[in-house]
Amino acid sequence: IIQSWSDEARSVALLIQGFDYLYLFIYPAWLALVAIALGTRLGGRWQPAGLVTGWVVLVAAPLDAVENYALIQQLLHGAGAAPAKLALWCALAKFALIAVAMGVLSLALCVWISRRLGRERASR
């Protein structure tokens, strides 16, 4: 597929990969901070869960960087089995880590909302 792209299409794809390098510094840091903040706010078992989730999601950044590198290599030098496999495995691992983190964050957010609503009802 890459070989059928024009030079302009490849340039655009390279630009998008460059922007993705900037984005990979934002989403892991944001998710990690939210995980740690929610864990701290909820306390108890949630505190270490938030800390572990924060660290786990930070592993997504280097996986994303390696995935981007492999994709850029294919854009510059043509499709190859090794870079394609590397990009695939890094992407799968990255999305698995993010999915786990989002699951923990969603559950923690539900607990936080539930506790907050419970306090409001109790204060009436």
Stretch-by-stretch model annotation:
Residues 15-29, 88-100:
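Membrane-interface loop-to-helix entry segments
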Residues 42-61:
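Interfacial segments of alpha-helical transmembrane regions
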Residues 9, 53-56, 83:
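N-terminal hydrophobic alpha-helix used for membrane targeting or insertion
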Residues 59-109:
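Alpha-helical transmembrane segments of multi-pass integral membrane proteins
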Residues 1-13:
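Extracytosolic (periplasmic/ER-lumenal) interhelical loops and adjacent juxtamembrane/interface segments
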Residues 121-124:
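Short, intrinsically disordered terminal tails adjacent to the first/last structured region
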Residues 7-10, 44, 78-81:
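Alpha-helical structural elements of signaling/regulatory helical domains
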Residues 22-41, 101-118:
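Transmembrane alpha-helical segments in integral membrane proteins
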